[in-house]
């Protein structure tokens, strides 16, 4: 029996990743490095013989453009794609746009680590009259007041990501289709926590690098049996460590 696989990829480096700023739902594009990372991710998948039947991504351009680059490298630009806000990055509330290192200097490394990586801790809320509040963005016009976040913890992110997985993505995988998901550091952490049944302390230390394909293999009951990155292990570890260090004071 063929092994069922799922590919997850965090978007390539964004302009605000490069500037070390909290991004959340702000719709910033890829940096030049990020575009190269996305292209390299597609090449890795091509080299390993991957091809897909369906793709999912968020409604934020850094993930969308990453997916486009990956599919272009695979010569699968025609692939059907579903975009959903439920795969968006975690909403960082009033931290969105702030420099992470400067915020750590003000509040301390541990507080910023908890805001970035803690399970149930939410950053300070946005007010609804703040221009950064998603209720002002037409792409979210169909969302209810309850669905429009003013801030999110990882726990709250899980509340939207996991139902989307179980109700939308997983049934397609069960039908035999080969699926790729291009999303964000925290929406993917939310999914990884669920798939691997990670504890809160364990997920605190998980950092997903930009632009590196993460492959899951499932058994006949669609339970994960293996998770691994494609690419050079030392380079991937260095990229993950760099993600962890973004929230530390200089």
UniProtKB/Swiss-Prot annotation:
InterPro entries: His_Pase_superF_clade-1 (IPR013078), His_PPase_superfam (IPR029033), PG/BPGM_mutase_AS (IPR001345), Phosphogly_mut1 (IPR005952). Pathway: Carbohydrate degradation; glycolysis; pyruvate from D-glyceraldehyde 3-phosphate: step 3/5. GO terms for molecular function: phosphoglycerate mutase activity. The active site is at 11 (tele-phosphohistidine intermediate), 89 (proton donor/acceptor). It catalyses: (2R)-2-phosphoglycerate = (2R)-3-phosphoglycerate. SMART domains: PGAM. Keywords: Gluconeogenesis, Glycolysis, Isomerase. Its EC number is 5.4.2.11. CDD domains: HP_PGM_like. Substrate binds at residues 10-17, 23-24, 62, 89-92, 100, 116-117, 185-186. GO terms for biological process: gluconeogenesis; glycolytic process. The record marks 184 as: Transition state stabilizer. Belongs to the phosphoglycerate mutase family. BPG-dependent PGAM subfamily. NCBIfam families: pgm_1, PRK14115.1. PANTHER family: PHOSPHOGLYCERATE MUTASE (PTHR11931). Catalyzes the interconversion of 2-phosphoglycerate and 3-phosphoglycerate. Homodimer. This is 2,3-bisphosphoglycerate-dependent phosphoglycerate mutase. The gene is gpmA.
